[in-house]
Every structure is written in structure tokens, then in C-alpha cells.
Amino acid sequence: MFVSYRWLQEYVDIKDVTAQELADKITKSGIEVEGVEVLNKGVKGVVVGHVLECEKHPEADKLSKCLIDIGEEEPVQIICGAANIAKGLKVPVAKVGAVLPGNFKIKKAKLRGEASHGMVCALQELGIDGKLVSKEYADGIFIFPSDAEVGADALEILNLHDEVLELGLTPNRADCLNMLGVAYEVAAIYGREVKLPAIDLQETAEKTSDYISVSVEAKEENPLYIAKMVKNVKIGPSPMWMQTRLMAAGIRPISNVVDITNYILMEYGQPLHAFDYDKLGSKEIVVRLAKEGEKIETLDDQERTLQSHHLVITNGTKALAVAGVMGGADSEVTNETVNVLIESAYFAGQTVRRTSKDLGLRSESSARFEKGIDPTRTFEAIQHAAALMAKYAGGEALEGVVEADNLQVQERTVSVTAEKVNRVLGTNISASEMGTMFTNLKFPFTEVEGTFHVNVPARRPDITISEDLVEEVGRLYGYDHIPVTLPSGTMTRGKLTSAQTKRRKVRRFLEGAGLYEAITYSLTSADKAKQYMVEPNEKAPVGLALPMSEERSQLRLSLVPQLLEAVSYNVARKNDSVALYEVGSIFLPTEEGELPKEEQHLAGVMTGLALHHAWQGEKKVVDFFVVKGVLEGLFDVLGVANQITYAPAKREGMHPGRTADIVLDGEVIGFIGQLHPEAEKQLDVKNTFVFELSLVKVFGADAEETYYAAIPRFPSMTRDMAVVVTKETKAGEMKQVIAEAGGELLKDVTLFDLYEGEKMEEGKKSLAFSMTYFDAERTLTDEEVTEAHNRVLTTVEEKFGAELRK
């Protein structure tokens, strides 16, 4: 919010306070002032000049030779290149010796052989942002009204001696999104009165109700709608003082009627809209919800497609405006407009916010409706606008208004005790001082034995509970005046949640296993969003309404595609061995219009060498079993290893013979495998393995407790076994059968070799297991181990048809 220091003085007497002092005081009261801008930017020596003569430069077609009266004894000759310079105009002139922004000094000069004693200025050359200059003067010099005094200070007329405070408002302080709201705040800080705008409205005998009727079908979305007619307006520029105030507020002047609606917006915080009455197409206004797919061309010349929850202003059939967001081009006020219908309404903030978001269209009006406006100002604002249009546009304000009023403004009373205020703030403020503060805030109240019952004005929707009143007292008392004290009360130790602890375990283990953590974008393209999903999902991924690019337009449903991008990027730069993991969220679509369900996943990608420089050993290439071993170690750390199984699977984008689902207690929670050769070809990578699983489901499983035991006093015995089985036999399933058959003496089973080669029969493979036998109470005899081992051999022969390799 940009606040003009001079404009603010119309509502609060602060002439004894500098703009910088005011900024410091406002900041200390709880509203941050992000900066104070001096509008003149060091400019001096610019006056109003009257063009007495203007003729073409004899040596240059695009230059004009002008004789200009600048209020001195003799007029001066100035060469000007502006296309809109002409005899009789009053223009800003930088005299010789003047200083313009950037410390640019004006000197006597010769342009194509002709002397030039000064410079005729455009507003941009005086330091005004080009975005705030009206279209009429965007490409030329500025022209003052004909009654401007020759030789007068041009900066004074342009209000460039003003200073502007930029307020960094938090969402709860929407009451300060207008000049009156800021005035109430400043008046409370300094204990002064607020001078409300005087409305001098002269109405004709004709009635607004003779020209228009109003009905509201969507009463919940639009509880209050007021309309008023102003006839016979003459479209032209708004008065100079209004234009300069709007520019100081960051709004570009357009015309008197439009500027007046914007001026009221900045003064009251009440959005208004002006319709060209003669373009309405009927004598009725109907406020309703849009029809699905209904279209309207808005003031920014864009055709918008509406949805059934959008609120529109119609003429009974056709949409004229998107309520609270932007008007329609068909009923826009133009230079030919004669009769104006003014709209002042209270639209539900939630409706406006959703419409604005859907259409990707934000405006000054929508920003205020979203955060909440004061419904008690709706009538006053439209009356003031009509008075200004009558005065500055030559219009005739018709008697009365037409309205559809279903609004019930309930009085809010919030109570707080002086004891609570002092206890919370750590102060010793008397009840009478608190009463003075509430009076300065213009909060009516009654006090009964130290308890304040405060009637909260409608302009302050942020005051709802007693703590809000405590904050108000603290702000006005001054946070810098509150005594410094040490914290008191019971202190508790912070701790990590179970999920946080487990996530740290995951990161530590994977980094210890040689993987590097990556953090990738949560946004991806539409074609990648549904790749490599753990669970199939028929619903469309959640997309952004206004994506920066198609590559970042959808919320991801898997972590793998983004990790593969990172691997492909590295491999393309000769970094062939890459091992990455990511702990991040995926976003599962729910019902239409609802927020997606966010779920934590773990994913990893490995390619190239698993061991780069093994000491006195061979380099090891990443394969399925390397990646599976990493996951098995992770599950062991998390205490769920015995609950995890693997099942062969076929997944899109994955190698059909080297992919497995990760199953936890019968439920598929993830997958592991090698990329499909076609996918590897597209990414230009080789032998790349991936995995992804749901951490939510892993963390939710019952983890096995960790037990500690003394170091064994008795030796263990190891036996190896290599068996030939069919290729369909699952090593994991056989391992489980071996563990059960070995009984209590068999403490560990490890698969250490898998062989499928030329020496094997067709459809056969060799699995080699190492088995460790141990008893903590005694030394096992060879006969006991042989008995248990033979039992294992017999079992695998019977269950799997295994043959012992010799």
C-alpha cells in the first residue's frame, strides 16, 4: 500500500510530524514501512511555461522551435522534439540551471544551429514511472490545465514535493488498504481525530429507480449490491490533484469517471465499477452465478471462459462483469459515454478469491474483496463517487439508489481484562490508560471493574478474540517500551517425531552406501507426471493454473523421472557413475477442486560403477542385486526387513525381466528394477537401475525391536550349498524355506552366487547359499550341524526340485 504523506494530512493533522518520523512510528506500532520515497528525486528549477510561438525547426523535420514564456522578463527559445508541442499550451519547462533526475543539469545548447535555453519535459523526465503516465502523455510532453499559472513551480502542481510511504501489510491488516484506514491507524498512534471526507451531493428530481432495477440470485455470494445513476457526464481528464494522488498510489490516470472510481477505492477501500448505462442492453441488473462455459471479454481485451461457481453481473441475460474482479469490455466507459451506472457492492471474499485464481486475473478490487472490506462504507462510497462525477464530469446525480440488501452486519463485542493485558505483555498499564488507547482506536467500549467490553467496528475484521485487544494495547503502548524480562514457565525439551528420526536414518544409511542426496523440482511436464508411479492412478495429475513453462506445469506423481533427468544430465557430461537418492513428496490427485494428497516417498537411481576404485579388487558394475542389497540394508536399519518380500513385476518403462515389486505385509509399497532399454536409449544412459517406495507405509509398519547380546563365547560353523533349480524359482522364497528348515541352530542365510551360463541346462540356474550355524550356550558338534544341514538339503529338494551341484 502506497500512502501519500500530503493526502494523509487531509484526514489527520500531522503537519508537525515529518514523513520519516511518521514511518518510524508506524513501524514501531506493528505495521512495517518498507520505505519512504521522495517523489521529486532531487529535481529543481522546473516551472510552468506558456508556448507563445511554435514553428518547425528549419534544419530538422522532427524538431520544433518554440518561444516560451516562463514567467521571467523575456520569453526563451527552446528546441523541442515532442510531437504534441503546439502554440498556446502550458507545459513543464526545465530552465537553464535546472536539475533533473540522475543529477542531469540543463545548460544552454545549440540544436542544428538554433539556440535552446531550457527543456520542455515529459513526466518520465521528471522521475515519474512511465507505467503511471496516462496514455495521452505516454509518448510526449505533459500539458498542464489552461489555468496553470505561468512561472509557477511545476513540481508543486504535479505534487512531486510529496513523499510516499510504502506499507508492508500483513493479510490481517486489510483495513489499511485505503487512506481512511491508514488515517485511523495514525490517529490512534498520535491520539488525534480523524476528519472524514465531506460529501456535497446535489441530486436531481429524477430517480435512479426509474432507470434500473437490481436483483441478486446468489445472495450468499453477494449479500449487498447498490447502484446509482449519473446522467450527462462529459468524459475528459480528471482534476490535476486527483491525477497526482492516484499516481502517488501507483495507479495510472485514465479519465475523470474511471479515475473517480479508483480514487474512491483508494480513499474508502470500497471497490466501485462504472458501467456505460447506454451499453447495458436492458434496464435491469441481475447478479447470478455464471453458466458453465459462459464467456465474457474483460477490460484487458481477453476472452474469459467462466465456471459455474464464478459470480457475474448481468443485464438479465448477458454477463457484463466478473463480480469483484474486472468489468466487461462491452459496457466499458469510453470517451463517448454519456450516462454512467455506478456499482458499489459487497462480494464474498472466498468467491472472489477463487474466481480470481481460476481466471489468473488479479486487480486492486479483487485484492480488497479477498481480504475483506468494510460493508458499512458501501453506501457512503457510492454517494461520494456520484458527487465527484457531478462536480468534475459535469454529470447529474439522480435521486437515491437501487439496492439488493441481504447483508446482516452483526455487532462484535470482545472483552478483555486489564489484568490479562498486563500479564500477557509484562507491563503495568493502568485501566485508564487502556481506555484512552481504545478511545484513540475509535473502539467504543464500556468498562466494568477493570474488564473492557469493546464494540469492534466493521472496518477491523481482524479483532475477534481478547488476545487481539491485547495486541492493540501492546502496539499503541509501544513494543519498545515493554520491559525486558527473562522467559518464565516450565521448559520442555524439543524432540524429533518418529517420522523425522526415521528419515534421518534413511539419509544416513543411503549416504553411507555411497548415494548422494538430490533435491529435484516438484513440478514436471504433463507427459512425465504419470511415469514410474508406484500405484496406478487414473485421475489426471494436479496442474498449475498459470505455469511458468510446460516443463514445470504439473505436480509430480513419482520422484523417479526428475532423478533420471539428473542422471542423464551427468552422464552427458562424462560423469558415467551416478548414484542419487531423494526423499520428497508426491502429490496424489483427489476429488476435483480439492487439494492433492501429499505423500512422502523415497527414490533412487544408480548407474555405472558401484565400486570405482576397489583396493586390490575388481571394479564392480551396478546391477539389480547391488541396488536390492542397498534396500535390504535400509529395511534392516528400519526394522522391517523380515516383513519385506519381492515379487517379479512388469511395469511401463521398466525392463520386463529385471523388475520387482516391493511388498510389505502383502501390500505393494514400491518397485525396484532396471530401466527398459528403450527408456535408457531416450535418456542416453546404460544399465541404469531405479527404485521408489512409500516412506509413509514403511514408517507405519511395526518395526522389530533391537536386542543386544554378549559377544559369543562359542564358535560358529559355516556350510555352503549350491543347487540347480528352474529359472522361475525365486531366491528369496528359497532363502526363507532354508531358514525355517535349519531350525534354531541356523542363524544366518546369505545368497552369495547366482549363475546362468553355458554350462547350465536350458531353463536352469544355480543358486549358492552360505549358512551359519551357532549355539550361544555350547560348541556345536559336526554331527549336529550335518543333521541340520541335511534337513535343509532334503527340504529344498522336495519343495523346489533342487539338485545339489557337485
UniProtKB/Swiss-Prot annotation:
Localization per record: Cytoplasm
B5 domain span: 409-484
Protein name: Phenylalanine--tRNA ligase beta subunit
NCBIfam families: pheT_bact, YtpR
Root EC class: ligase
InterPro entries per UniProt: aa-tRNA-synth_II/BPL/LPL, B3/B4_tRNA-bd, DNA-bd_dom_put_sf, Fdx_antiC-bd, Fdx_antiC-bd_sf, NA-bd_OB-fold, Phe-tRNA-ligase_IIc_bsu, Phe-tRNA-ligase_IIc_bsu_bact
PANTHER family membership: PHENYLALANINE--TRNA LIGASE BETA SUBUNIT, PHENYLALANYL-TRNA SYNTHETASE BETA CHAIN AND LEUCINE-RICH REPEAT-CONTAINING PROTEIN 47
Domain FDX-ACB: 712-805
GO terms, biological process: phenylalanyl-tRNA aminoacylation
GO annotations of cellular component type: phenylalanine-tRNA ligase complex
UniProt keywords, alphabetically: Aminoacyl-tRNA synthetase, ATP-binding, Cytoplasm, Ligase, Magnesium, Metal-binding, Nucleotide-binding, Protein biosynthesis, RNA-binding, tRNA-binding
EC numbers, comma separated: 6.1.1.20
Record has Cytoplasm as a keyword: yes
Summary of subunit composition and partner proteins: Tetramer of two alpha and two beta subunits.
The tRNA-binding domain, residue ranges: 40-155
Gene: pheT
